[in-house]
């Protein structure tokens, strides 16, 4: 692969994603990281601002264009830790090198769904047909196959209701894609909800092949307990097909601090908003889990706005942590 595909997904200064940021020194490899690492403007001595006007929001108060800590999955806010980069690259290599099954696991809220969206965004539609399949609890075998077939925009013939018939339709669709020069890439999110029967359906899909190559790649994203479940002997055949695996873990204190700063900058803030000690408190109370960080920081911004606090400090983080 030429270059780093994940780097290409992170917005740069050329698309106005960081409007208002001063020009960086020539030759710096990453102007955004230069800004993150640079000393922040000194905080004002006073920590309280005048009372809010009736129409003012916490975004205006903190000089933000949008909420940096919303729970929606937005690739523009992806902060590239080494751990997330590793997962992305492993899943990408599985696709590009015709590995039939690969898996990323991690605690809830560590960024698995965001990785699925980055893969969906990155994969070349001329070479691949990537589909994200969101698994729901108690989804049946036929329900799973119908979901995949629907994502392929294939109308089911009347009378096709059983697993065998659905698998035949899917296999024919995979062959058609192959003849077009494309490969089906199935990205299964929330795989910890898959039943044993559905796991064996995925194994069957992974067996669609020609003598020269595999014709599908299935990427499984699940909570950490799913990997424990697959250790049971009944899943030996499935587990042995998984050549690529990755594990997402909570962020370190350093990564957590950079994550918060990065998201604030993407949202339009160009100076320090969280005091350094407050960033340490964010990591301590969130455990370094991305979703928990977002919840705590968003609550801190709202609480800080109501208290007219121009910066987020440790006491404010502690108050908000007690509310979670």
Give the positions of each predicted feature.
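C-terminal alpha-helical "lid" subdomain
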Residues: 2-48, 258-261, 265-324
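Conserved NTP-binding/hydrolysis module of P-loop NTPases
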Residues: 67, 139-158
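Short regulatory helix/loop adjacent to the ATP-binding pocket of P-loop NTPases
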Residues: 120, 226-241
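Conserved catalytic segments around the Walker B and adjacent sensor/switch elements
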Residues: 125-136
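Conserved AAA+ ATPase "SRH/arginine-finger" region at the nucleotide-binding site
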Residues: 135-137, 230, 243-255
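Conserved AAA+ ATPase "sensor/coupling" helix adjacent to the nucleotide-binding pocket
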Residues: 150-152, 224-225, 233, 254-270
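Conserved Walker B catalytic segment
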Residues: 171-175, 179-220, 233
